[in-house]
Amino acid sequence: MSRLCGIFGKPYIDLSELVDTSGFEAIDEELMCALPRVEPSYTGGSLKWMGVTAPWVDADPYADYMRVIEGFSREQLVRFVSYGKAPEGFDPDAADQHHHFGDETDNPLSREQMLYLKYRYGVYFPWKVCYHLLENDRWEDKHSGDGKDFTEEARRMFPRTVAFIEQLPFQEIGRCVLFGIEANDHAPAHRDSEPGKALAIAQSISFDPRGNKRFYVCDPKGENKTIVDAPIYWFNDMDYHGVDPDPFFRYSIRVDGVFENDFVERIRAAQRR
């Protein structure tokens, strides 16, 4: 049986002994009351094309938007592009042009393009409620807080949530995102970094104020699957991870950055007790 990468020999680290979660009920209330007043986006619709999904996910029937776009005719591509901003130098008649769209590209999808892909081509976006409280430009800079801060809107609409995040044990925060999943949707098993290529375990804290999001980690063959049973946790994103479907909306917030110098040792000590 293949094994999880894990952290300190465990599938994930429950941080609830080290971080006070007594305010989660109030945080959840704030988030649910304010989310209808902001404009979340979609994300995750090109994970297969990005090459980060588990092998069994790659063969499932859920449509990936970049794979769909790569199969467009000239007319289909022109129509799709018309729903957003055309890429720089876009020429639908140039045989040597291969434009990429969406996450981790220079051509983010517009809201209209996302909906068009979903309605017309059945593209599946796992996270239809994605809201950045603190923005990052690319995946590679998600641990650097250089020049970054929480958005004015996030501070205004989610003050209690931002205050909680700011007291977490980070030296710097490079990204903070609310990932929400609609009723009956799932997040496919994927990993954020590849074992053997990353020098260290990426430092992040995720928290689920409601405790009802069935987030899991699993081994490379999908044989060993562990549902995270903790309100706040650190997991190894070299492990495949995803979210099982449920008949209701679920969400969590992930904070990426660099831990305070002694936090990892405090975690080690807590695991030995």
Show which residues each predicted segment covers.
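Fe(II)/2-oxoglutarate oxygenase catalytic core
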Residues: 1-200, 210-213, 217-219, 223-225, ...
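Short, surface-exposed charged micro-motifs
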Residues: 177, 204, 242
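Short Gly/Pro-enriched loop/turn and capping motifs at secondary-structure junctions
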Residues: 210-213, 240-241, 260
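Conserved metal-binding segment of the jelly-roll/cupin
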Residues: 225-240
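A short hydrophobic beta-strand segment most commonly corresponding to one strand
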Residues: 200-207, 232-234, 248-267
